[in-house]
Swiss-Prot record:
Annotated NCBIfam families: PRK04423.1
Subcellular location field: Cell outer membrane
Family: Belongs to the LptD family.
Protein's name in the database: LPS-assembly protein LptD
Signal peptide residues on this chain, from the entry's feature table: 1-22
Keywords, alphabetical: Cell outer membrane, Membrane, Signal
Function of the molecule: Together with LptE, is involved in the assembly of lipopolysaccharide (LPS) at the surface of the outer membrane.
Entry GO terms, CC: cell outer membrane; transporter complex
Species in which this protein is naturally found: Xanthomonas oryzae pv. oryzae (strain KACC10331 / KXO85)
Top-rank lineage group of the source organism: Bacteria
Subunit text: Component of the lipopolysaccharide transport and assembly complex. Interacts with LptE and LptA.
Major localisation: membrane
Gene coding for it: lptD
Alphabetical list of InterPro entries matching this protein: LipoPS_assembly_LptD, LptD, LptD_C, OstA-like_N
GO biological process: Gram-negative-bacterium-type cell outer membrane assembly; lipopolysaccharide transport
Amino acid sequence: MRRALRLLPLPLSIAICLPAMAADKPFNWGLCPTVDPLPGFDGAPAADPKAAEMRQQLPTDIEGDQLSGTSTTPQYQGNVALKRGDQFLGADNLRMDTETGNYIAEGNVRYQDTSFRMVADRAEGNQDTDTHKVTNIRYQLVERRGNGDAESVDLQGQVGQMHRSTYTTCDPSQPIWRVRAPEIDVDNGEGFGTARNAVLQIGNVPVLYFPWFKFPIDDRRQTGLLFPQFGLSRRNGFDYLQPIYLNLAPNYDATLLPRYMSKRGFMFGTEFRYLYEGGRGEVTGNYLPNDKLRDKDRGSVFYSGYHNVNSNWQARSSISWVSDTRYVEDFTSRLNGMGSASSLQSTVGIYGTGETWTAGLMAERWQLTDYTLDERSLPYNRQPRAYFNWEKPFGIFEAGVYAEAVRFTHDDSYFVQPPSPSVPGEANNRDNNDKYVRTNIRNQEYGSGSRLDLKPYVSMPLSGAAWFFTPTLAWRYTAYQLDSTLAKTGPLTGDRSPSRSLPIASVDAGLYFDRETSLLGTNYLNTLEPRMYYLYVPYRDQDDLPVFDTRPFTFSYGQLFRDTRYTGADRQNDANQLTLAVTSRWLRQDDGREKLSLSAGQILYFSDSRVTINNSTNAVAGSEQTIDQGKSAWVVDANYMINDRWSMGATYQWNPNSRKEDLASLRTRYLLDNDGIINLAYRYRRNLIDNSDQLKQADFSFLYPINPSWSAVGRYYYSLQDRKPLEIIGGVQWDSCCLAVRGLVRRFVRNRDGQMDNSIQIEFVLKGLSSFGQNTDRTLRRAILGYYRDDLYLVPPSNTTTNPDDYDPNLIP
């Protein structure tokens, strides 16, 4: 999503022109007075840029309580109002020379046009030449909160010059910051002001001097320098990024990103954005010639964009590339916005959707970005992939088909030599990651193959006011064409054209009961929703089928009602099982909000499930626990709204076979005044293969408003299993009408080896003028769920519905 544009200021040493820049978050003016410093004047015309351009061709209208003088030198007294186009001039007295066009206005002078609103002691000028001089003024920008005062201002058309003036977005009664300059030129036509020999004051203390400083007076963008970003780290040394914004056209722009790192050298980068009626896109590239630490050239390219072909089809692409496997860790910082990842995904495709169908043709490739891993950790590339999904009702029946054809490729894997510590504890040394060595020893040769997957089905969805009954019969056919290298890779049998076909039968049925009840004086609608799901799939030996993109689903409440345990088409489990589940809800009758919901369910296995993914040579596929005749783990989901501020949720899985819990999750959230929030969560997962603890974590985060101006933020994310913190954040925020200051201290796990790193982030926001320092919003939004209150109401993509971007019939309930 394209961000809004804003202006940033410059450092002491550079005289510059500042354009508007993309902002991650709109300025919060909530602490400002509800009225403008200078409210609009009664009778003044609305702001109209077109009227401003035609101002001199329009007639002048003058009215007042009394009129005296002659026809050539009239004098108006009392509630005088002069109007022409977008101009308004109000005063107690006005003398006019109709032959020359000169005028003098005195007493309670008020002036307004498309850009400015001001009050003054006196105004004089010439209407014919559209020149004016206003003295002893207080002003406000019409389209922004910018305001200030000046000894005088000279106006000519849409250009003006203020003398001995100030500029701020603060309320005049509390000017926390302001720019003071002997001259400020204002160009309403171009949409910016220029201050010469300007001084930025915080309170009454001067803190920065600007020989030449430009700032916006409306929302138009301007070419120039953005405020630099800088930091200090052990990896890069002193790090300085100076963005240069280029406003090339109304629908495209660019930002040059020169960056200096004292330990590495100069990096050159650029960002280009474009927008047109049928689409938009953004490309970013970086190049570091001869990195002094790595002794080689390094770089990256990122692109994302889309084009609407027509109302049914859209082309989309997302391309990512880095020069080496250490690039992400070396250059991960708030300076370029990259995040840590073990791989990067690139996709290019065209996608279509209609009333009864979805389709797509795309290509996908993965790149390794973690130097501690080899290529075996990468998923298969899909080059290309085509899918088509269709479903349509026919009377009481519904028929459909899910189809996919894919060509899979994979780069060969080469052995990565891990560090061999010579002394105890050396493996945990901060710089020991440099000792990982990528060798020329191939440890796995990958072949390629193609797969066709077809799944036609017919169902009969029947329902009434209190029940539903849906039998479904499907047939799944999957065929492969493998090259000889892959076909001969164990445990495959050497068959280059294996296939699998089998029927899938299911019955999904449920009832709905409700009753009206009351509890503690509140009326509720209480529901009881039992549900049954029977699934039968005969066994087919699939050991001769490769595993390309198939993984076991994480067992959850939603998994109780799927017709397969796997995400892809390489495996289709056999099944003779019955799911029994029930949900109960308590809904407040006055507003329909859910007070409490409880769901519980279990699968009864009438026979062993013999199909597994454990014999795969694809390391990414993982492994799974075999399914024996008996019962699955109990799955319980609960959500409870204690009140409008406090909510709790829990997920619990109890395995009757091992008599142990497989999963436990507890989370609670409390909403404070002034958009504050407190989150607390506990997560536990057991490794079902060896019964060890796979994950045991506690997570506490908060945004705590101390008062309307001060707030504290923090996160403590701890691994109980490893007995070490994963991330610690502490910070404070101070906010006012026109100034915000944020400071954070962060300690976090840096890489897969568990090495820790520290960072300090400080950000100053002069609202409506500038923002400098490091972007704290990105860090806090990721770490504290609800840091932006609107994030709490975002609905994540469902894993039980078809997404036109990602065919997978296994995700269809």
